[in-house]
Amino acid sequence: MANCAIVGINWGDEGKGRMVDLLTEDYDVVVRFQGGGNAGHTVINEKGKFALHLLPSGIFRSGVVNILGNGVALDPENLWMEMQDVMAKGVELTPENLKISDRASLLLPWHRDMDELEETRLADKKYGSTKQGIAPFYSDKYQKKTVLAGELFYPEELKVHLADLMEWKNLTLTKVYGAKPYTMAMLEEWLETYCEKIKPYVCDTGAFLKEAQANGKNILFEAQLGSLRDLDYGIYPYTTSSNTTAAYAPIGSGLPSAKINDVIGVVKAYSTCVGEGPFVCEMFGDEAEELRKNGFEYGAKTGRPRRVGPIDIVATRYGVEVQAATAIALTKLDVLSYMDKIPVCTHYLLNGEQTDRFPFPSALKNAKPVIEYFDGWKCDISGARSWDDLPGAAQEYVTFIEKQIGCPIKYVSVGPERDSIVIR
């Protein structure tokens, strides 16, 4: 048995979904262990292009069991809509290949309202939320003000529980934000329209995972977002509200006894960021727009243009440390093929001194990038399938990054398709 976690090293959007899709042929189970519908994992295969927000990226592989663990922000509405979308494109979803933890907390209808209302209140001080209700959800979860998916099997008790929560939440909606209150009729419609649809998939996934582990099954843990969005280790407060690290996988998956053998950290060949907060290497103007256009850098969930810049060695090295990565997948190297000279941020200039250490979040706004330039390769590399197929300049770029971040780069993606990969 071998367990592997695939995690983001930077701000998210690194290409984790395509790596999970690639590697699932070697695994029996894929588990999402944190986060919700606020980010997207893009997968391109023979069935088409998919932007998965809640579903694990193993759903395209026959024989793979996909699990939404107890650490996930389970949004029944978004999940059911996503399930319908992928099933309409020929992907089979049954209670045999998709299982939802009965201990996963449900993202309730008012969580999205609270998210949008708070971002509006913050105005120019907003965090850049995707407005999917993630922060209000996790806040309520830790206040024990949500319901568990398993409560769907106890409908009478569930309605009483929801009524109590609604009374409490309506006070905030009406008194703080001046918004309309919820009614039980609204919640009953939500239960019938969405929760009843996903109910057949809800089960004791912890027991399933323990049995899988005992039987020597290979388990792949799929993270959302990246190190710099982690609640504890990220650029606080411009983080998500969950732990995005491999260390959280055993807890959020429902298999606390899991031993993670390999941690594959996914790094984009340049930097991108969605949302607010310090972004030391940010490009602006025409230079940024050209990179954004070549990489099609628009949020999978929001469609917002992503902030872009050169690869940030300082932030990436920190992300590798946070994740305890054992190998790296470098994605979208092909996007840089248009550049004559390729910029790399090797250090930060902070308080008049160069540093290669990632600073405390409050200091980041004062950091300036120290840029080094590498020769571009100026040719199409999308057909490369071996290391020797890559031009010398591309090899030099990859090996420089590898040396600087202190972790071997095992995979290099040169295109969006499943087989557009170089394995070293």
Predicted regions: what is each one?
Residues M1-R424:
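Non-transmembrane, aqueous-exposed alpha-helical and coiled segments at domain scale
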